Amino acid sequence: MVNTSEENNSNAVMPRKFQGGMNQVGHGGGRIVGQNRRALGGINQNFVHGRPYPCVVHKRVLSEKHEICEKKQADLGHRPITRRFAAKIAGSQQSYAEKTKNSNPLNLNEFGNSIAIDDELKSPEDQPEPMTLEHTEPMHSDPLEMEEVEMEDIEGEMILDIDSCDANNSLAVVEYIEDLHAYYRKIEYLGCVSPTYMDEQLDLNERMRAILVDWLIEVHDKFDLMQETLFLTVNLIDRFLAKQNVVRKKLQLVGLVAMLLACKYEEVSVPVVSDLIHIADRAYTRKDILEMEKLMLNTLQYNMSLPTAYVFMRRFLKAAQADKKLELVAFFLVDLSLVEYEMLKFPPSLVAAAAVYTAQCTVSGFKHWNKTCEWHTNYSEDQLLECSMLMVGFHQKAGAGKLTGVHRKYGSAKFSFTAKCEPACFLLENKNQP
């Protein structure tokens, strides 16, 4: 009986791990490794090729290449040398020698620069020879074009990631803050009213509304309420008056009830009804306040959660990297806008963006609106100019006339005497331009 050698017995091949995959089981119950080693065709590659950068390249003669290939072939698979495997290695070496004789002496590097090999200077002692390098012209030979490309790259990198500092703050909801504000922008128009709704009121006018809001700003400051409460109060007043006719003597009651509802929605500690009666000089009773509260909620269909300018102010101030001074000036300008009836023609997001833009111009003394602010507000400087010029006009006359509640509020030490800052009058220079 003929004894079979272990090298031809598949069961004698011990299972071992090879780079490139897991061991596979053969038909005889043993392990085969043919698909788990590197392909033999990838071993005998032409190693004479250009470097990825300009340098002196040496070439090897055929004898050195055979030594390298044989060494790699011996080390690569780490498998037993069977008769079939040895024959395959010998055949691949022979085919490699034939390809080397017919190979083209011109190779290209990764960047397209040609590298010429001079075969006439080949040394019989198998000494390495340098290869000549042909330089090509650069792609951008014009310095002006290169400068324009560089400036475009710099401008593309000006948008800052304003949420990276809050990555570890779970309350900042960095993961979906952009989606949240996109939703605010989508529904903000639901809280807007017609800028001509006062024409439908029989006993009210724009001046009466301004007096009411100016008084409520002082009440809001005396009660030391949160800033968002004031914005929601004015929003509830306008939305209610746009749907319900109110007589003049009930207008102050509408303002008190709107502030009461805003406090219940925003504040932790809500003013009691008796305090509201007291500040109204007892013009209304407890019953009047409760009845008006029911009427207002039914008229608004209990829809209280609509974005106001305050929601956008916090985000836009963060985009502007505002300090305390810039923040106070921005809120001073937006509070002045609450009093003015004509500002109802602008959506809350635009009012907030214009307040931040005008505040930056006021503090710096020149026009300032960078790419980061434009990206996060979705408003360009040209889109904000109309609203900003109106705010500058409100700032100029803030301390004059009878409605000076906002000026007195921001002229105190509590608000760092912000009302005393000079308005950005240079923005009004564009008023008469087309």
UniProtKB/Swiss-Prot annotation:
Molecular function (Gene Ontology), one example: cyclin-dependent protein serine/threonine kinase regulator activity
Protein origin, superkingdom: Eukaryota
- Keyword S-adenosyl-L-methionine on entry: no
One matching Pfam family is Cyclin_C
Q: Which UniProt keywords apply?
A: Cell cycle, Cell division, Cyclin, Mitosis
Matches recorded under SUPFAM superfamilies: Cyclin-like
GO BP field? cell division; mitotic cell cycle phase transition
The record ties this protein, via InterPro entries, to: Cyclin (IPR039361), Cyclin-like_dom (IPR013763), Cyclin-like_sf (IPR036915), Cyclin_A/B-like (IPR046965), Cyclin_C-dom (IPR004367), Cyclin_N (IPR006671), Cyclins_cyclin-box (IPR048258)
The record's note on quaternary structure and interaction partners says: Interacts with the CDC2 protein kinase to form a serine/threonine kinase holoenzyme complex also known as maturation promoting factor (MPF). The cyclin subunit imparts substrate specificity to the complex.
Q: What does this protein do?
A: Essential for the control of the cell cycle at the G2/M (mitosis) transition.
Q: Which family does it belong to?
A: Belongs to the cyclin family. Cyclin AB subfamily.
This protein is called G2/mitotic-specific cyclin-2
Q: What is the organism of origin for this protein?
A: Medicago sativa subsp. varia (Alfalfa)
